[in-house]
Each structure stands twice: as C-alpha cells, then as structure tokens.
Amino acid sequence: MSAALKRYDLDKLAVATVASHTALQILRGAKRYGFRTIAVAQRNADFYRQFSFIDEVWTADFSNFRHVAEKLVEKNALFIPHGSYVEYVGWRQALEAPVPTLGCRELLRWEADQYKKMELLAAAGIPTPRYYKRAEEAEGPVIVKLFGAKGGRGYFVAKNREELAKRIKAVEGDYIIQEYVFGVPAYYHYFASPVYNRVEIFGMDIRYETNVDGRTFGWVEPTFVVVGNLPLVLRESLLPVVHKYGVDFAKAVREKVSCELAGPYCLESIIRDDMTIVVFEFSGRIVAGTNVYMGVGSPYSVLYFDEPMDMGERIAHEIKEAAARGILEKLFT
C-alpha cells in the first residue's frame, strides 16, 4: 500500500494522469463519478484546458517526475498510468513516484523488456510466437520490435534470415526478433477488479497503422506506427478463450511478479485462419484502443453492469466502490 494513501482524505479524492493517450477518457469518467480531475501536460496544455471536466491542467518537466508526484500527493490525487506516461516518464521514475498509482506498478518494469514480456506470457500458458535473440537463429519471416511503449515506431518485417541480418545492423537500442504470425490482429481489453473479484472482458480493437494500412501501392516499406484504433466485436465462440487468457495472465502476474493486477490491461494477438489465437504482446495498463468506445460505452460492459460504460468510467466506478468498502489499497501501489 502506498504510504501516501494512508494519509488521504477519502472524501476529497482527485484523479490525475498525464495529458495524452487516454487522458480525456480517464478524466471524463472520473468527473462523471464525482472526482476532482488533474491533467499533467508536458505540452499541449491549452488543448486540455478547453474541457470543463478537467479541473486543473498543470505543465511539468517530466525529467523530474518525482516533484510532480509529490505535488499530486498534496492534492489527494490517485494516478492512472497509460502508454504515454510509460514512454515519456520512463519505468524507473514510474516505479519511484510517491503518488498512489493504479495497478501493479512492478509490471511496468516487465513491460519495458520484450524478453520479460514473453517470459510472463509463457508462464501464463498463453500461445506466443517463437522469438530469437540473434539474427542467425531466426527462421522464416520475422518482425523486429523495439523495447518500450513506442506505438509500433521502428518495427520492421524481414522475409528471411539474410534480409534480417542486413537490416538489423541499423537498429539502435534493445529489440526482440519475433516469428511473424499470419492472420488478423485483435487487441483485447480487460479489467481486473479487486472489488468484484473477477477479470472482465471489456472490449477489443484493431490498430490503424502506417504504412501497413495505408494506400502505399507497394512503393514504400511497411511500417507499424499507430495513428488510431478501430472497434472490433469478436465471434462469441472466441470469447471463452479470450477470457481464459486474461484470467491466466492475471494469475501469472500474481505468481511471477508478486503483485495483483488491478484495473485495465491488454493482450495483443493474431487470430489465425484455424481460429487459434497467438498473443505476441501485453500492456499492463489502459491502452489507447479503449478510446473507440469513449462516451458511448463498451458493448461488453452491459454484460456486467447492464449499462454502457467506457474504460474511464469503469476505472472511476472501481475507485468509488473501493473507497466505499475501504479497500483502495487493493487498487493502488
């Protein structure tokens, strides 16, 4: 439990996040549930000030996020991490920030390392692509992925070992070489609820990526930079498997990372034509794909609450219920 959380006035809680990624969804949901809201901006602060559901917009230097976190504690703030926070602030600062942070904070360390990611998925018993540490080990077509939450930037595909050996020389920084799995992509949104003691399927999406999804006519190299997301509803026959993977992943986090999942997370997959699902990635926090149902609610939320709810509202609902039951320490680290 966060030491700061013990000192909080539960009647005056605020919800805060970095002004990017899913901030609008998170803060809109928090305001609808009666919380004060704070957006912390590195840039584009004026854009966020136009929205009445954001009570305060701060500008900050993310190179010293500890100072920001200490100010948030003074405001009784609960912090919601997302992909931009992980990328801009970095997992080391995120681990040390003294503000109460939603979810398993230690998972951010695992999320920053592609090999540890694959280790955790394997521990969950979830089917994954083969992966390689050296180009000379690779077989068949592969995708090369950089470490960190980069939204697909810098990824590339190589058709064979020879092409890979040539192109890998230009890669700077840490990377993983994964088997390229043929099929369609699908990204699953889950919510781990300590309040209701369950893992919920909350939605799914497809990423819209350049130049893979662009009109390139074969003239440019495929790239995987994410520019947006598209909603997806799966065949119902696939839902039991998807849910099981989410439950198994939460169990693996408990056993391998020694902390409980709380709040949103995501498994990223390819579905083959034989309907098997291969998971190649996870995100241990809210993903931008949840923005596809902001304001209208996930089609799956009605299965649990009999009313539409987006992920920002789902987070706020969990916080409110946990505060009322005196179990906020199960959500925040």
UniProtKB/Swiss-Prot annotation:
Question: According to the lineage, what is the superkingdom?
Answer: Archaea
Q: Which cofactor does it need?
A: Mg(2+); Mn(2+)
The alphabetical list of record keywords is: ATP-binding, Ligase, Magnesium, Manganese, Metal-binding, Nucleotide-binding, Purine biosynthesis
Q: Where is the ATP-grasp domain?
A: 118-313
Instruction: Give the note describing cofactor binding and stoichiometry.
Output: Binds 1 Mg(2+) or Mn(2+) ion per subunit.
Query: Which SUPFAM superfamilies does this one have?
Result: Glutathione synthetase ATP-binding domain-like (SSF56059), PreATP-grasp domain (SSF52440)
| Pathway where it operates | Purine metabolism; IMP biosynthesis via de novo pathway; 5-formamido-1-(5-phospho-D-ribosyl)imidazole-4-carboxamide from 5-amino-1-(5-phospho-D-ribosyl)imidazole-4-carboxamide (formate route): step 1/1
Question: What family does this belong to?
Answer: Belongs to the phosphohexose mutase family.
Q: Which PANTHER family does the record cross-reference, listed alphabetically? A: 5-FORMAMINOIMIDAZOLE-4-CARBOXAMIDE-1-(BETA)-D-RIBOFURANOSYL 5'-MONOPHOSPHATE SYNTHETASE, 5-FORMAMINOIMIDAZOLE-4-CARBOXAMIDE-1-(BETA)-D-RIBOFURANOSYL 5'-MONOPHOSPHATE SYNTHETASE-RELATED
What's the protein name? 5-formaminoimidazole-4-carboxamide-1-(beta)-D-ribofuranosyl 5'-monophosphate synthetase
Q: Which organism is it from?
A: Pyrobaculum calidifontis (strain DSM 21063 / JCM 11548 / VA1)
